């Protein structure tokens, strides 16, 4: 259920509550109670998003991109380890404005950003022959947006610019290499890359689809 709710795959509030009611007859009270809290969290998150939009209008603030935020209680939703990440400037601005709103509204609550798990976005390209729209993880977008400035980076440079740990960075690069958007300088595999290894943008990238989901595992 957590995966469906966080990723917007739910069939609707009524359907989810109906499923929980059916589970009530078969499962322990604590488990069913947690499911109910998760559903309430989703409703509260939507209300918070509405309040944020009102805050933006009231302060005459505009965001540089479409920014969809979900806030859940950590006790109700399982979460993975937090990843250190230097966000792209445009996204960082959105985060800072939301934190300003949230800290003012709920001064006793602390936000932990899960960039490495359910965080997703869409990025439009204008550097290839076709105008692709890539659905990517926040980590993938952070790396790809660096190639607006240069066509080639060393692993060490990418690590410094993104602040990602080397293991996380290599996983991201491996996914982008498999997607044939990036390429290694000497045809190295991700496991063989070093700080001095070179990663370049594949300017000849070609795909039959204009909307490409690179957030999913590449076969």
Residue ranges, per PLM feature:
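Eukaryotic scaffold/interaction segments
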Residues: 1-219
């Amino acid at each position: 259920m957590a995966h469906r709710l966080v990723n917007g795959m739910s069939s609707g509030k009524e359907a989810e509550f109906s499923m929980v009611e059916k589970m009530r007859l078969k499962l322990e009270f604590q488990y069913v109670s947690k499911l109910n809290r998760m559903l309430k969290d989703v409703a509260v998150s939507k209300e918070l998003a509405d309040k944020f939009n009102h805050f933006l209008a009231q302060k005459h603030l505009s965001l540089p991109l479409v920014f969809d935020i979900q806030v859940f209680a950590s006790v109700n939703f399982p979460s993975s380890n937090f990843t250190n990440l230097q966000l792209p400037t445009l996204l960082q601005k959105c985060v800072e404005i939301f934190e300003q709103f949230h800290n003012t509204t709920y001064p006793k609550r602390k936000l932990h950003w899960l960039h490495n798990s359910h965080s997703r976005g869409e990025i439009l390209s204008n550097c290839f022959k076709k105008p692709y729209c890539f659905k990517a993880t926040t980590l993938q977008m952070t790396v790809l947006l660096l190639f607006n400035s240069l066509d080639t980076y060393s692993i060490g440079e990418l690590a410094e610019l993104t602040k990602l740990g080397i293991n996380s960075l290599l996983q991201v690069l491996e996914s982008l290499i498999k997607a044939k958007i990036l390429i290694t300088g000497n045809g190295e595999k991700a496991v063989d890359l070093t700080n001095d290894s070179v990663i370049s943008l594949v300017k000849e990238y070609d795909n039959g689809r204009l909307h490409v989901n690179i957030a999913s595992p590449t076969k």
